[in-house]
Amino acid sequence: MLTNQSHNDRIAQAVRLHRESIIGFLRELIAQTQHGEAAVQNAIAVASAKMGCKVERVKYDPQTVPMVQEFAAEQAITQGLRECVVAKTGTAGAGRSLLFFGHPDSEPLSRLAEWKHDPFKGEISQQRIYGWGVADDLAGVAIYTQAMAVLKACGLQPKGEVTLVSTPSKRHARGVSALLHQGLTADAAIYLHPAESGMGMKEIKAFASGQLEFRIRVQGAAPPTSEPLQTAFAHLAVNPVAKAFEVFQALQKLDEQRGKEIFHPLLDQAVGRSTNIMVSMINCDVADSLSRVRHECWLGGAISFAPPEPMDQVMGQVQNALAELAKGDSWFSANPPQLHWDSGVTGAQVNADHPLYQTLAAAIHRTTGHTPRVNPMHTSSDIRNPMVQKNIPTVGLGPLCGALSQNGQTDEWVDVEDYLAAVTVVASTILDWCGAEPANG
């Protein structure tokens, strides 16, 4: 009977032995990125089949996925059919089941000429592997794929069912949610994605705040003149910029109120506050003349809110704050600010004493010597999806990374040794959670 430490040592030895092929698979995914998402998915499907997994490719339409406590404006949702790769191994009902998911889609290719390293060759320099999408999220998909390959090399397999899914995620692609609403389930789930925080596996994602994104249209009125330059008549106009500032002040007041009333210990310990309303944009219609009153002004921003606060409650508070502006203001009474919600997701959390968290944390400690902590600052993390949609406890982890393209940077990278350690951690976690038995054949 293998102990957790002994099977971890056996797995770590296999990772060292197969180091080049484990890195090579990630380099293959990087190379396929230039050919598009379908090429990446095909490489994942082929590799999963070679490991003896039962592979299924599932097409779906993101716009028809029924979402629980989540929404997005139609124009924000990715268009057209997408495809998930689903690979299964182990035996359903023979032990606890585990779902791994990551996303194969990356940011649209851009600014490639600014890269110092070839974005599609997986170049390695100073223990970093570089490539387009390597940290978002090719490494995540590669980790759980190679973890299964390592178990096979060890002559081991999970007793319980393990499901590996490569699911589109960006721009509300909703891949994992599509599968969950089609019947995919598990006792627990782990989201594999390099840590954007820069902490690598010193942390576990077990907490995700919810987030709402909004825009508010504020109308104005030009002064009663046909003169092209309106500055001298400004006192006779309704300046939408000034009225937008009143809206901004109302949002600030609500933000201050919520900051006093809403408390979550993890967020408060990390940043001293548990919720925020951030106005990040103000924009008027075409400013072809600075001497004319604008017709309208738009404000936009986002709201973070801690679980378990309901999303509808937060939305209602914003609506009430805007409605209050009409009291005693004849302009807003006749022309109320128009609130548009662009998107919203609900937060979720797994406590640090949950068996899933404890299992993963123990595997990380055995492999790296570090005791991980919870990262509560990754707002709207994909760990929320199995929890909110189907009440499946979910955590996330990933290796050290940096210079992500989604942050406007170049030469995206993942730490090679941390990537290899993550493969060890995931393979060990599979056996700890699902149980181990000799591989067939």
Give residue spans per PLM region.
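Metal-dependent amide/peptide-bond hydrolase catalytic core
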Residues: M1-R10, M199, E213-G441
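Acidic/His- and Gly-rich active-site-bordering loop/insert found
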Residues: L2-I129, P158
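Residue-level signal for inorganic ion chemistry
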Residues: L29, T33, H193, A244, ...
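Short helix-capping segments at alpha-helix termini
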Residues: M51, C154-P158, L325-F332
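Hydrophobic/aromatic beta-strand patches that form the interior of the parallel beta-sheet core
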Residues: E56, L98-F100, A188-I190, M278-S280, ...
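Fold-level recognition of mixed alpha/beta catalytic cores in primary-metabolism enzymes, strongest
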Residues: I129, V134, L138-D255, V293, ...
